[in-house]
Amino acid sequence: LLPHIGFKDSDKGTYINVSYERPLGDKDVVYADLNYYSKAGYKPVYGLEHNERNFKVTYENGWYEDDDEWVRKENNIRFDYKNHHIAPGLPLSYSAYVERGLWKNDDTGRKSWHMEYGAFLNHDRIYLFNSKNTSLDLTIGKKWTRESAEDSVESTNVYYATLGQKISPKWNTWVGYYREDFTSNVFTYDQPDMAKELRNGLQYIMDDKNTFTVVNRYDLDQKENYETKYSWTHKFCCWDLSLIYKHKDIDNDNAFEVKFDFVNW
């Protein structure tokens, strides 16, 4: 049992989360994320996971949130085919997933049998300039989403590219390009905030206990800044304290979050 306590934002308020896991043998785990928000109420997630060498299967019931939209997943089953190399010596690997469940928007009451599946091709991390300090990660893929509420099937190509640079033992920076379209008109949960995103970050490791990070997100289609997030994390002996401030340029919205994560209990 590892508790997490904090203040999320003005819509959710103060929260407490307790995560519980219990093995049911070598390959099966039952788990629960018990989440309570002072404004949103009790939003738990219960699940069962079966793990094999090549794949895993997850069954879940519970609530998930994204951009203030609460979605309840009922009888949600997900199959993940784990990342595998195509052939020995070839720096390419592939992965895939299928997910299906009855989803419900808590605010609108709208329900839909949501089915989503995707496949991805990943390149092994590329180290540039004969140095481990500069790295490039590349992924391409395809996603499909079927919604019973609209009897629709939408798809999108997916392109991810991230270039990372370790400037010094204390400084890291990165820039990423992300391309993905909306595949659901019923839910905004787990959908991209924008179709074409340029993201860059800077991290300063002050010492073994303090880390400061800035992440900026830019909308390439609208040619405007989308969001900037500032975070500071301090490690204590048994728990971590995180202060997070987010400013959304698109609607001039500000959000502040405080997190206490217990790492030894």
Task: Identify the residue ranges that each predicted region occupies.
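Exposed, low-structure sequence patches enriched in small/polar residues
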Residues: 89-97, 104-265
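Transmembrane beta-strand segments of Gram-negative outer membrane beta-barrel proteins
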Residues: 1-12, 28-31, 56-59, 92-98, ...
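Conserved short loop/turn motifs at secondary-structure junctions
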Residues: 33-38, 62-67, 216-220, 247
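Outer-membrane beta-barrel initiation region
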Residues: 1-51, 262
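Structured alpha-helical segments in the cores of large, soluble enzyme domains
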Residues: 12-21, 46-48, 79, 83, ...
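Flexible loop and strand-edge segments within Gram-negative outer membrane beta-barrel domains
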Residues: 39-49, 55-83, 97-105, 110, ...
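Transmembrane beta-barrel architecture of outer-membrane proteins
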Residues: 14, 36, 40-44, 61-65, ...
